[in-house]
Amino acid sequence: MGLGSRSAKQRMHSDFEPHPDAEMCTACNRCVTWCPVDAIVIGPDRVAEVDYELCYGCGECVAACPFGAIAIAWKTEPASIQEKIVEHVAGVLKDKPGKIVYLSFITNVTPDCDCWHFSDAPVVADIGVLASTDIVAIDQAAYDLVTAAKGLAGTKGEGLAEGADKFQEMSGIDGTVAMEYAERKGVGVRTYELKTLA
């Protein structure tokens, strides 16, 4: 996502629309403050209103609302967004084989998207840093390590045992779709060998 232009991010997220609930909205203005494209205003009836021409579906408003008043309305399955992200990644990497080393810092693992300007408490203890020349293998390894970790007490990960898919449990979304699709597209492979350095 980091290398995607604003228009590319909009295309990746185009299947998502936030819908404020008039009954639950308190007009606290938090969603307005957090919207990166100023697509939300508090309307005359004191309810958040979204300009869908400006909104690119980042979801910051959903996470920012302390009252849960903004629902996620997907036009298609979340797997579609994961596949779109992989398509963009494949485009960025196609002319760079063997020229990139990937680092994955498995620290402060958040329950929600880390592209937002805020976060909740980490859901597992810090695990460490991974390095690889294969973007898919490093993602799979990181995913597996988080899955193998125990959820931290007092967080959204509380009660999630070692071996439980933390991301699936917290979001209801299968996070392996992107890695499976990337492997099918030839972006990388999901198999890996972990070598621990002291």
What does each model-found stretch correspond to?
Residues 1-198:
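Extended, low-polarity segments enriched in aliphatic/aromatic residues
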